[in-house]
Amino acid sequence: MAEERSQRSRDRSREEKIDDGMIEKLVAVNRVSKTVKGGRQFTFTALTIVGNGEGSVGFGYGKAREVPVAIQKSMEYARKRMSNVSLNNGTLWHPVKANHGAASVFMKPASEGTGVIAGGAMRAVLEAVGVKNVLAKAIGSRNPINLVRATLKGLEDMQSPTHIALKRGKNVRDFSHGS
């Protein structure tokens, strides 16, 4: 019974809640203390990812005196700051490198059936945006906030061959592999 309860609470911490078609993921909750004259003041921070599973994703960072309020604030903030990402049938268009601070990420498209091979904060972002097959590696700092920012930066900088061809005024066939 106790094992079942601990398993449920462990699953609930990273559970995706789907309402209005959005995937919500809790990446990290942190307790922060501030020392004042009367002792310590504790506050909580929450880092969350919100996505629609079809190329739209946002992240939020909320702070409050209680955990549920911090999570709610971060979810609202994430919904306000959504950005669109161009995907290629559930994977990336091309390999991507990005960094934020000391956190670097490398993401590579993968064939169908591979799944999301990524760790921690990167996995949450990739699943929320709707990537089904990808190989990803975090290099350097494993700070969740910087990893999320680096992953989003890499996804936002990725461009489809159609977009690149349009920008250069060329035909998409000019970019085919092997020529």
UniProtKB/Swiss-Prot annotation:
Any single GO BP term: translation
Keywords: Ribonucleoprotein, Ribosomal protein, RNA-binding, rRNA-binding
Cellular compartments per GO CC: small ribosomal subunit
Domain S5 DRBM: start-end pairs: 22-85
Domain of life, per lineage: Bacteria
GO MF assignments: rRNA binding; structural constituent of ribosome
Pfam families: Ribosomal_S5, Ribosomal_S5_C
Known partners and oligomeric status: Part of the 30S ribosomal subunit. Contacts proteins S4 and S8.
UniProt-listed HAMAP family: Ribosomal_uS5_B (MF_01307_B)
Domain comment quoted from the record: The N-terminal domain interacts with the head of the 30S subunit; the C-terminal domain interacts with the body and contacts protein S4. The interaction surface between S4 and S5 is involved in control of translational fidelity.
Function statement: With S4 and S12 plays an important role in translational accuracy.
Recorded family membership: Belongs to the universal ribosomal protein uS5 family.
Official protein name in the record: Small ribosomal subunit protein uS5
Classification lineage: Bacteria, Pseudomonadati, Pseudomonadota, Gammaproteobacteria, Lysobacterales
GN (gene name): rpsE
